[in-house]
Amino acid sequence: MKPPSGSTKKSKPPARGRAGRARAPSRILLAALFAAAFALVPALAAVPRAIRLLEALAPEGPSVLGLSAPAGSFLLGACLFALAFVAVRIPAIAYVAVHETTHALFGLLSGARVTRMRVAEEAGSVDVSRPNAINLLAPYFFPLPCVAALLLFGLASLVFPMAGRPAGAVAAGICGAAWGFHVCFTLNALLQRQTDLDAYGFLFSFVLVLLLNELFLFFAYVALSPVRLVPALGILRALGADSFGWFLDGLFARI
């Protein structure tokens, strides 16, 4: 995709489109974003550590793929979709629609105007009045189908509790398949050398996308498991502080 300085935003299939017009970021902003990305690198290690610790602390119960039922079912659903993605030609228009809808959604959330959206088999476009790093990168870190599935099962669980039941494992598997959709198509799009990641500096964009994907998995794990949010956030904060401390110790040891 093309940086915000251009009049169009295009990419090769399966996601090609336009996110609007804006000035290219200044060198000062790019330098600040580079520094921010460098500072966030320790968080990339903290989030997976937190998920692993939550899984290790999971109560005894049925297991799937050697993991707790929610985590194993989620992973199984993602793997099954990945196999289907490799074995069967899934229409690219499904991802193009999700990709452009996510651009538009985050554009609206940021207060911009979305004036036009086009979705076709091999390409798509959306006009956003004030593109920025978040709405430009949103399709790469916000798995819209998985979020929709989580919200759907969350509402259903208000009527029919699913945690610890077979229905909960099925729900986790469906959410995992939806996340697999996001990962497979996003990786396929990134292999086309998307210029979206270059607009605000590749390192900043890469770190932000990876970190927000990790954070989504963290919150999805909490949502699908019996884990309470507040203790889970406490674990994440503690491991984040530990990772940053380790990072700073290593950095100053080399100075």
Regions inferred by a protein language model and the residue ranges of each:
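Short, hydrophobic/aliphatic alpha-helical segments
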Residues: 3, 8, 80-86
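Selected alpha-helical membrane-embedding segments in polytopic membrane proteins
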Residues: 88-92, 108-115
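Metalloprotease/metallohydrolase-associated module, dominated by Zn2+-dependent proteases
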Residues: 2-8, 12-64, 71, 119-255
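Canonical hydrophobic alpha-helical transmembrane segment
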Residues: 69-82
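Active-site recognition of the HExxH zinc-binding catalytic motif
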Residues: 95-108
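Short pre-active-site segment immediately N-terminal to the catalytic Zn-binding motif
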Residues: 81-98, 125, 129-132
